[in-house]
């Protein structure tokens, strides 16, 4: 049975279809593909697993030769995105084209940005294959590539026409990638839904064993929360920034260690602990909240400490480039309890240094 979550954005509203064996039926996508050319963008890891199934699903439609990119965060670059543009141009594909992102967050972000940019905008569809992309990056219209000086620094807000989430894809996901996705799942509980956080605490083993019902509930609940937040604040002027819990610290880890060395979710996990510790130092939460957050992340085998090789100066160098910085002031998303968070711009460098040195 398929679960549908609707992201309501007026004329740009779109459905998120969640279920099993969704690659066997093109019906959820058909309305977006009629009289269109289709270009699938995927990577070298996903192509052998799912490209043939998706092409078979779309056999009644006009599919161009797909683009198969290298796999990894280190390839989330303008250079690789240019390969998408080259394929579009070499195959004479115009504005009547739909790009389909078949892969994880890197493929989704690059394909979405290419769609936003090509001939000033063509349609695109997300088919996320990793847990992280299913619960987070495929929903909400954030598209981007990295720059050597910062993560996701070049991009656009551009919503997909549809998101198709087949939970069967998680059966081929490496355990490390699954754990990385759980960092984003846990984030939703911390910032928005205390009951969901408690449910996660009670269902660790079910999720780690890929129990179908547990996975579908977790994914759908995350998508519901993400949709609710995006509907309130599509372009991250206010409440949507809460979705960046752990990301200011996490992006610093990714940039300093080298993109792809730490997975995004791993860096977010360590960053979430640092954010919780900062909250504790400010008196926003007591030690028990920090312990609950840390214990749940650790239960999914996620890192809960920063890299030993990173010092405060390395952190702050990258954190100052964060997209939430306003008038030169660092703005941090910090837990205020389980199920609630806030944005703080009055955290001193001295306090941050104390937290980072303790981590």
Curated annotation (Swiss-Prot):
Which PANTHER family does the entry mention?
A: 3-DEHYDROQUINATE SYNTHASE (PTHR43622), 3-DEHYDROQUINATE SYNTHASE, CHLOROPLASTIC (PTHR43622:SF7)
Q: Which residues bind NAD(+)?
A: 71-76, 105-109, 129-130, 142, 151, 169-172
- Protein's pathway: Metabolic intermediate biosynthesis; chorismate biosynthesis; chorismate from D-erythrose 4-phosphate and phosphoenolpyruvate: step 2/7
> Gene name, please?
aroB
GO molecular function terms noted in the UniProt entry? 3-dehydroquinate synthase activity; metal ion binding; nucleotide binding
Q: What is its EC number?
A: 4.2.3.4
Per UniProt, subcellular location reads as: Cytoplasm
Q: Which cofactor does it need?
A: Co(2+); Zn(2+); NAD(+)
The record's family statement is:
Belongs to the sugar phosphate cyclases superfamily. Dehydroquinate synthase family.
Q: What keywords are assigned to this protein?
A: Amino-acid biosynthesis, Aromatic amino acid biosynthesis, Cobalt, Cytoplasm, Lyase, Metal-binding, NAD, Nucleotide-binding, Zinc
What does the UniProt function comment say about this protein? Catalyzes the conversion of 3-deoxy-D-arabino-heptulosonate 7-phosphate (DAHP) to dehydroquinate (DHQ).
Q: Which Gene3D superfamilies match?
A: 3.40.50.1970, Dehydroquinate synthase-like - alpha domain (1.20.1090.10)
Q: Which organism is it from?
A: Shewanella halifaxensis (strain HAW-EB4)
One of its GO biological process terms is: chorismate biosynthetic process
- Please report the name of this protein according to its UniProt entry: 3-dehydroquinate synthase
Q: Which HAMAP family match?
A: DHQ_synthase
Please write the reaction equations for the catalytic activity of this protein. 7-phospho-2-dehydro-3-deoxy-D-arabino-heptonate = 3-dehydroquinate + phosphate
Query: GO cellular component annotations, sorted alphabetically?
Result: cytoplasm
